[in-house]
Amino acid sequence: MKTLTASLIKEEDMWVAKCPEVGTVSQGASVEEAVANLREATELYLEEFPRKINIRSIFTTFDVENVKA
């Protein structure tokens, strides 16, 4: 078992979840549903395309100018 990262973004009425280590993406109506769907998608992907996963993710923030909210 590996612990992977889920990055979530709210888009309109859905949550979009991404796994940066594998590249899988899924969505759900709630954070919990999006993560559960991402887990399933990632497991299915890795069953079809097995590979060694190096977990070396680094997340940071950055500022941008002239963004209209």
Task: Please place each PLM-identified region on the residue numbering.
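Intrinsically disordered, low-complexity regions of eukaryotic proteins
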Residues: 13, 23, 65-67
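Short, charged, surface-exposed hinge/linker loops at domain edges
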Residues: 1-4, 36-69
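A short, exposed loop/beta-hairpin motif centered on an aromatic-Gly-Thr core
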Residues: 22-31
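Short aromatic-glycine-(Arg/Gly/Cys) micro-motifs in beta-strand/loop hairpins
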Residues: 5-21
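Flexible, active-site-adjacent loop/turn segments at secondary-structure boundaries
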Residues: 20-23, 44
